[in-house]
Each structure stands twice: as structure tokens, then as C-alpha cells.
Amino acid sequence: SDGSFWLKETASEIFKLFWGNPNYDVTGNGGITGFFQWGDLDFFLLDNRYHRTSNNNFTEPRQMLGRDQIDWLINALSFSQAPFKFIVVGGQVLSTGAVYENYSTYPEERKYLLNKIREAKIEGIVFLDGDRHHTILSKMQENENVYPMYDLTCSPLTSGTNNDDESYNSYGIKETLVNIHNFGILNVSGPAKNRELTIEIFDKDGEELWTKSIKANDLKYK
């Protein structure tokens, strides 16, 4: 669905009744954008449907998140002191493939968001997303003066899978591609000044498929 969905207000109310999120619509502009903390970690929950331009509408400036939501996010990220700042989105963000409902099909807004993150010198960014019916970890580092941003795309556990090879995604780490039913677990450990994120991906029977560790100190500007 997109911003034209005539029942989006009803859908928002149903979401609030079903999910026990601590907050919704923190931007005050509609939708279910939210935020929560877990220990010393911050999670920013974005709504990529409520303000979305139709996939087939190219007659106007296109948006997936909307300027108000992005500007709130940049401000909230700038305030955060968390070693890892998890940005949770319904669709793939860092992938360079302009396919399906990826953020790359909204190139101007995607560029605006990523540029704002870099301009504000926000550290510790990790994107969490899905809706691709396969799993892959992407890593974007434009040059040696910036730290690498990661994007964990993880799906599906119960819906259909596909055989997409993500060959169009120049940031994709190919050995992390999973085309079977799977799920992930994130674990953050270590002392306050040296936190480490461990990503583990399992098949539907609980067998580990791959693991990757990322140090918070490696997600900082030099």
C-alpha cells in the first residue's frame, strides 16, 4: 500500500491495537513512526507506507518516508548517545538495486537521507529491514573518510522465498545471502566503551547459517 490507501487511518488504529509499541506517530504527522530504547541501544521505527508515493507515480517528487519523518529522524539520531542506532524500515534501504519496493526506487529522497546522516556525522548506524523474501547483509562505505553503514535485510520466516541473487546490489555481502526460510538474532555485548553487535542468521529449524560481528568503535568517524 501507499499514501493513497483510503483506509490508512483505520489501518493505523488496528496496528496500535495489535502492537504494544511504547509510542506511535512521534512526528505528529500521521502514521506509526516510533522510538524505543533497550539498555544502551536506540531503535528508530519508521513508517514507509503512510506518506509513500505510489510505485507507479512519477508525475511529482517521489517520497517513501517524507521530509518531516526524515528531519525528525536526523534530529533524534543527533541527540542519541547510543553506541548502535538501529533504524528499522519496512523496505531495503542501502541496496543499490532500484527494484520492487526498494528505497533506490526513490533515489532523490534516499540520497537526501543518507547525505543528512553523513553531514550530521551521526555514528553507529545500522539499518534493519525486510520485505525481500530473502536475507542479505549490505555494507556501504563511500570512501576511507567515513565509517561503513550496515543494512541487515532479513526475511522470510513463514512467507514465500525467492532465488534472487542480489547481483544488482553493489553493497551486498554475497556470502550472507540466504534464499530459504530464516530468522535472525541480534546480540550486543561487551563493556560500555567497546560494545559489539553479533548478528546470527538461522534456518527455520534453528541451524545457524552465518554470523557476523560488528564493533561499535568501527562505526565512528576518524
Where are these regions (language model features)?
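Metal-dependent phosphoester/phosphodiester hydrolase catalytic core
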Residues: 1-222
